[in-house]
Amino acid sequence: MHFDVLQRLSLAGDAMKPNEDAALAEANAAVVFDGATPVSEPLMPGRSDAAWIAQFGARRVMAHLKEADTPRAALRHALADAERSFTGLRRRAPRQRHEWPYASMMLAVPRDDGLDALWYGDCALLLVRPDGSFDSIGQAIAKKALEASDAARFAKATNTAPTGALDTMQFLELIRSARNKLNATGGTWLFAPMAKASEHVSHARVAAPAGSFVLVCTDGFLALAGDYRSYTPKALVGAAASKGLVTLGAELRALEDGDPEGRAFPRFKKSDDATALLLRLA
Protein backbone atom coordinates (compact mmCIF):
# COMPACT_ATOMS: atom_id res chain seq x y z
CA MET A 1 0.00 0.00 0.00
CA HIS A 2 0.92 3.67 -0.10
CA PHE A 3 -0.15 6.92 1.55
CA ASP A 4 -2.47 9.45 0.00
CA VAL A 5 -1.23 12.70 1.56
CA LEU A 6 -4.44 14.64 2.27
CA GLN A 7 -3.41 17.64 4.38
CA ARG A 8 -0.39 19.24 6.05
CA LEU A 9 -0.12 21.87 8.78
CA SER A 10 2.80 23.36 10.70
CA LEU A 11 2.32 26.39 12.95
CA ALA A 12 5.07 28.17 14.87
CA GLY A 13 4.29 28.64 18.54
CA ASP A 14 5.84 32.12 18.52
CA ALA A 15 5.97 34.24 15.37
CA MET A 16 9.24 35.79 16.58
CA LYS A 17 11.04 32.45 16.92
CA PRO A 18 11.89 29.62 14.51
CA ASN A 19 9.41 26.79 14.09
CA GLU A 20 11.30 23.87 15.62
CA ASP A 21 8.98 21.24 14.14
CA ALA A 22 9.49 19.62 10.74
CA ALA A 23 7.33 17.34 8.62
CA LEU A 24 7.58 15.59 5.27
CA ALA A 25 5.20 13.18 3.57
CA GLU A 26 5.23 11.22 0.32
CA ALA A 27 3.46 8.12 -0.92
CA ASN A 28 6.15 5.90 0.62
CA ALA A 29 6.50 7.48 4.08
CA ALA A 30 5.56 10.32 6.42
CA VAL A 31 7.55 11.78 9.28
CA VAL A 32 7.22 14.54 11.87
CA PHE A 33 9.99 15.88 14.11
CA ASP A 34 9.69 18.09 17.18
CA GLY A 35 12.97 19.72 18.15
CA ALA A 36 13.47 20.00 21.91
CA THR A 37 13.49 23.62 23.12
CA PRO A 38 17.15 24.70 23.45
CA VAL A 39 18.38 25.35 26.99
CA SER A 40 21.88 26.57 26.13
CA GLU A 41 23.70 28.64 23.54
CA PRO A 42 23.49 27.33 19.95
CA LEU A 43 26.37 25.22 18.75
CA MET A 44 25.33 25.08 15.09
CA PRO A 45 25.05 27.87 12.51
CA GLY A 46 21.58 29.39 12.39
CA ARG A 47 19.09 30.58 14.97
CA SER A 48 18.11 27.27 16.54
CA ASP A 49 19.83 23.93 17.02
CA ALA A 50 16.39 22.40 17.62
CA ALA A 51 15.15 23.59 14.23
CA TRP A 52 18.33 22.26 12.63
CA ILE A 53 18.01 18.73 14.03
CA ALA A 54 14.30 18.55 13.16
CA GLN A 55 14.73 19.74 9.58
CA PHE A 56 17.93 17.78 8.96
CA GLY A 57 16.46 14.62 10.43
CA ALA A 58 13.28 14.81 8.38
CA ARG A 59 15.15 15.40 5.13
CA ARG A 60 17.69 12.62 5.65
CA VAL A 61 15.20 9.99 6.82
CA MET A 62 13.03 10.60 3.76
CA ALA A 63 16.04 10.68 1.44
CA HIS A 64 17.25 7.29 2.65
CA LEU A 65 13.77 5.81 2.35
CA LYS A 66 13.68 6.97 -1.28
CA GLU A 67 16.86 4.97 -1.79
CA ALA A 68 14.84 1.86 -0.81
CA ASP A 69 16.29 1.56 2.68
CA THR A 70 14.17 -0.28 5.23
CA PRO A 71 12.72 2.05 7.91
CA ARG A 72 15.35 1.02 10.46
CA ALA A 73 18.18 1.33 7.95
CA ALA A 74 16.95 4.75 6.84
CA LEU A 75 16.89 5.89 10.46
CA ARG A 76 20.34 4.47 11.15
CA HIS A 77 21.81 6.22 8.12
CA ALA A 78 20.05 9.51 8.93
CA LEU A 79 21.45 9.48 12.46
CA ALA A 80 24.94 8.80 11.11
CA ASP A 81 24.48 11.72 8.69
CA ALA A 82 23.43 13.95 11.59
CA GLU A 83 26.45 12.92 13.65
CA ARG A 84 28.83 13.74 10.80
CA SER A 85 27.18 17.09 10.08
CA PHE A 86 27.07 18.09 13.75
CA THR A 87 30.71 17.14 14.27
CA GLY A 88 31.78 19.06 11.17
CA LEU A 89 29.75 22.25 11.61
CA ARG A 90 29.43 22.84 15.35
CA ARG A 91 31.27 25.75 16.96
CA ARG A 92 32.60 23.48 19.71
CA ALA A 93 31.91 20.08 21.22
CA PRO A 94 29.10 19.91 23.82
CA ARG A 95 30.36 20.01 27.40
CA GLN A 96 27.22 18.47 28.89
CA ARG A 97 24.37 16.42 27.45
CA HIS A 98 21.87 19.26 27.73
CA GLU A 99 23.83 21.12 25.04
CA TRP A 100 23.14 18.49 22.38
CA PRO A 101 20.26 19.04 19.93
CA TYR A 102 17.44 16.54 20.47
CA ALA A 103 14.13 15.85 18.77
CA SER A 104 11.08 13.66 19.14
CA MET A 105 10.06 11.82 15.97
CA MET A 106 7.24 9.74 14.51
CA LEU A 107 7.92 7.91 11.26
CA ALA A 108 5.18 6.00 9.42
CA VAL A 109 5.92 3.68 6.50
CA PRO A 110 3.09 1.84 4.70
CA ARG A 111 3.17 -1.94 4.25
CA ASP A 112 0.96 -4.36 2.34
CA ASP A 113 -1.05 -5.05 5.51
CA GLY A 114 -0.85 -1.69 7.31
CA LEU A 115 2.14 0.34 8.42
CA ASP A 116 5.32 0.40 10.46
CA ALA A 117 5.76 3.14 13.06
CA LEU A 118 9.12 4.13 14.54
CA TRP A 119 9.37 6.86 17.13
CA TYR A 120 11.26 8.74 19.78
CA GLY A 121 9.72 10.94 22.45
CA ASP A 122 6.27 12.46 22.37
CA CYS A 123 5.11 12.64 18.76
CA ALA A 124 2.00 10.58 17.96
CA LEU A 125 0.34 8.44 15.31
CA LEU A 126 -3.44 8.06 15.46
CA LEU A 127 -5.17 5.60 13.11
CA VAL A 128 -8.87 5.03 12.42
CA ARG A 129 -9.90 2.09 10.25
CA PRO A 130 -12.97 2.04 7.99
CA ASP A 131 -14.78 -0.16 10.55
CA GLY A 132 -14.24 2.53 13.21
CA SER A 133 -11.58 0.72 15.21
CA PHE A 134 -8.78 2.91 16.52
CA ASP A 135 -5.10 2.70 17.44
CA SER A 136 -2.86 5.27 19.14
CA ILE A 137 0.89 4.81 18.77
CA GLY A 138 3.40 6.44 21.12
CA GLN A 139 3.23 7.81 24.64
CA ALA A 140 2.36 11.40 23.77
CA ILE A 141 -1.01 11.58 25.56
CA ALA A 142 0.43 10.25 28.81
CA LYS A 143 3.44 12.54 28.55
CA LYS A 144 1.22 15.59 27.95
CA ALA A 145 -0.78 14.74 31.08
CA LEU A 146 2.43 14.47 33.10
CA GLU A 147 3.69 17.79 31.73
CA ALA A 148 0.41 19.50 32.67
CA SER A 149 0.73 18.13 36.20
CA ASP A 150 4.33 19.34 36.40
CA ALA A 151 3.34 22.80 35.15
CA ALA A 152 0.59 23.15 37.75
CA ARG A 153 2.90 21.97 40.53
CA PHE A 154 5.74 24.29 39.47
CA ALA A 155 3.39 27.28 39.28
CA LYS A 156 2.05 26.59 42.76
CA ALA A 157 5.52 26.14 44.25
CA THR A 158 6.91 29.32 42.69
CA ASN A 159 3.74 31.45 42.76
CA THR A 160 4.06 32.18 39.04
CA ALA A 161 1.86 31.60 36.03
CA PRO A 162 2.71 28.23 34.43
CA THR A 163 3.70 29.85 31.14
CA GLY A 164 6.14 32.08 33.01
CA ALA A 165 8.25 29.11 34.08
CA LEU A 166 10.47 29.24 31.00
CA ASP A 167 11.75 32.65 32.10
CA THR A 168 13.00 31.42 35.48
CA MET A 169 16.49 30.10 36.18
CA GLN A 170 14.98 27.52 38.53
CA PHE A 171 13.02 25.92 35.70
CA LEU A 172 15.94 26.16 33.29
CA GLU A 173 18.13 24.21 35.71
CA LEU A 174 15.43 21.54 36.08
CA ILE A 175 15.24 21.11 32.32
CA ARG A 176 19.01 20.97 31.99
CA SER A 177 19.17 18.31 34.69
CA ALA A 178 16.60 16.21 32.84
CA ARG A 179 18.38 16.66 29.50
CA ASN A 180 21.66 15.53 31.04
CA LYS A 181 20.06 12.08 31.49
CA LEU A 182 19.02 11.71 27.85
CA ASN A 183 20.62 9.25 25.42
CA ALA A 184 22.52 7.48 28.17
CA THR A 185 22.39 3.96 29.55
CA GLY A 186 19.12 3.44 31.39
CA GLY A 187 17.66 6.74 30.23
CA THR A 188 15.25 8.00 27.60
CA TRP A 189 16.54 8.22 24.04
CA LEU A 190 15.63 10.86 21.46
CA PHE A 191 16.73 11.56 17.89
CA ALA A 192 20.10 13.32 18.15
CA PRO A 193 23.37 13.52 16.20
CA MET A 194 24.49 10.22 17.73
CA ALA A 195 24.50 7.19 15.44
CA LYS A 196 24.00 4.81 18.37
CA ALA A 197 20.53 6.29 18.99
CA SER A 198 19.30 3.99 16.20
CA GLU A 199 19.55 1.09 18.64
CA HIS A 200 16.97 2.68 20.96
CA VAL A 201 14.05 3.61 18.69
CA SER A 202 10.57 2.36 19.58
CA HIS A 203 8.72 0.34 16.93
CA ALA A 204 5.20 -0.93 16.29
CA ARG A 205 3.64 -2.76 13.36
CA VAL A 206 0.00 -1.79 12.89
CA ALA A 207 -2.44 -3.85 10.83
CA ALA A 208 -4.83 -1.65 8.87
CA PRO A 209 -6.69 -1.91 5.54
CA ALA A 210 -6.87 0.55 2.69
CA GLY A 211 -9.13 3.47 3.54
CA SER A 212 -7.73 3.90 7.06
CA PHE A 213 -7.04 7.49 8.11
CA VAL A 214 -3.68 8.21 9.74
CA LEU A 215 -2.86 11.38 11.68
CA VAL A 216 0.84 11.89 12.43
CA CYS A 217 1.50 14.87 14.69
CA THR A 218 3.69 16.60 17.23
CA ASP A 219 2.56 17.07 20.81
CA GLY A 220 1.78 20.73 20.17
CA PHE A 221 -1.04 19.73 17.81
CA LEU A 222 -2.06 16.76 19.94
CA ALA A 223 -2.83 19.21 22.76
CA LEU A 224 -6.35 19.43 21.28
CA ALA A 225 -6.87 15.86 22.50
CA GLY A 226 -4.64 16.17 25.56
CA ASP A 227 -4.21 19.43 27.45
CA TYR A 228 -7.35 21.10 26.12
CA ARG A 229 -9.63 18.05 25.96
CA SER A 230 -11.47 19.42 22.93
CA TYR A 231 -11.48 15.97 21.29
CA THR A 232 -10.76 12.39 22.12
CA PRO A 233 -7.76 11.13 20.15
CA LYS A 234 -10.06 9.15 17.85
CA ALA A 235 -12.39 12.12 17.35
CA LEU A 236 -9.39 14.30 16.50
CA VAL A 237 -8.72 12.14 13.43
CA GLY A 238 -12.35 12.48 12.35
CA ALA A 239 -12.25 16.23 12.88
CA ALA A 240 -9.07 16.49 10.82
CA ALA A 241 -10.80 14.68 7.96
CA SER A 242 -14.09 16.62 8.21
CA LYS A 243 -13.05 20.10 9.35
CA GLY A 244 -9.49 20.20 8.05
CA LEU A 245 -6.16 20.79 9.77
CA VAL A 246 -6.26 24.56 9.18
CA THR A 247 -9.54 24.84 11.09
CA LEU A 248 -8.19 22.71 13.92
CA GLY A 249 -5.07 24.87 14.05
CA ALA A 250 -7.27 27.94 14.46
CA GLU A 251 -9.21 26.21 17.25
CA LEU A 252 -5.95 25.35 18.97
CA ARG A 253 -4.64 28.90 18.91
CA ALA A 254 -8.00 30.34 20.02
CA LEU A 255 -7.95 28.13 23.11
CA GLU A 256 -4.41 29.23 23.92
CA ASP A 257 -5.15 32.91 23.32
CA GLY A 258 -8.03 32.59 25.79
CA ASP A 259 -5.70 31.21 28.48
CA PRO A 260 -2.36 32.97 27.89
CA GLU A 261 -0.95 32.28 31.38
CA GLY A 262 -1.80 28.58 31.39
CA ARG A 263 -4.04 28.73 34.45
CA ALA A 264 -7.06 26.92 33.00
CA PHE A 265 -4.88 24.51 31.03
CA PRO A 266 -1.51 24.25 32.84
CA ARG A 267 1.41 24.17 30.41
CA PHE A 268 4.88 25.66 30.14
CA LYS A 269 4.36 27.52 26.84
CA LYS A 270 1.42 29.69 25.84
CA SER A 271 1.63 28.07 22.40
CA ASP A 272 3.89 25.29 21.21
CA ASP A 273 4.85 24.61 17.62
CA ALA A 274 2.05 22.45 16.20
CA THR A 275 2.47 20.14 13.22
CA ALA A 276 0.23 17.46 11.70
CA LEU A 277 -0.04 15.29 8.59
CA LEU A 278 -3.34 13.68 7.57
CA LEU A 279 -2.88 10.58 5.44
CA ARG A 280 -4.98 7.75 4.07
CA LEU A 281 -3.79 4.24 3.37
CA ALA A 282 -4.48 3.31 -0.24
Kindly give the residue locations of the regions a language model identified.
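PP2C/PPM-type serine/threonine phosphatase catalytic domain
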Residues: 1-282
